[in-house]
């Protein structure tokens, strides 16, 4: 009797897990689609937007470091997406304070990626031409019409990616880049 109940429970769990395949962890590779283009980071650190979905610079993995912070890393070149205090986006091969971001799931199922500096939210955003946009608003304001530049969709890859990137350690390195105002 107990074996039959255990068998039925296992079968129902297998059915449920098949229905929940869209819910996956943060380290699954994918592409971030922001403002009608894919976010890309060159190995030399340049951040840009492209419409080419087969570009290797657009394949990222989001890794949860702790409850409130994630790191966005290129799954092929192992370059981290970072943002300095001025809101400038850049890529870095070394992990620093600038590379830790927050992710927020909006009501419309889009994600926003941001950092908090001096009571201001600084978002990962792209202009219409694909260049990074500095988008910084106070904590009390809503994104509103500026959300076009910062709302991101995560497109999961339909094929497996095997990376040779080292594991991310949660220790924080000093700020990587000085902000020049």
Swiss-Prot record:
What is the name attached to this protein's record?
Answer: Fibroblast growth factor homolog
PROSITE patterns xrefs: HBGF_FGF (PS00247)
Keyword annotations: Growth factor, Signal
Family note: Belongs to the heparin-binding growth factors family.
- What gene, per UniProt, encodes this protein? FGF
Is the keyword Signal assigned to this protein? yes
According to its UniProt entry, this protein's organism is Autographa californica nuclear polyhedrosis virus (AcMNPV)
Gene3D superfamilies recorded for this chain? 2.80.10.50
The GO terms this record gives for MF are:
growth factor activity
InterPro entries from the xrefs?
Fibroblast_GF_fam, IL1/FGF
Q: Name one Pfam family in it.
A: FGF
Leader peptide range in chain numbering: 1-16
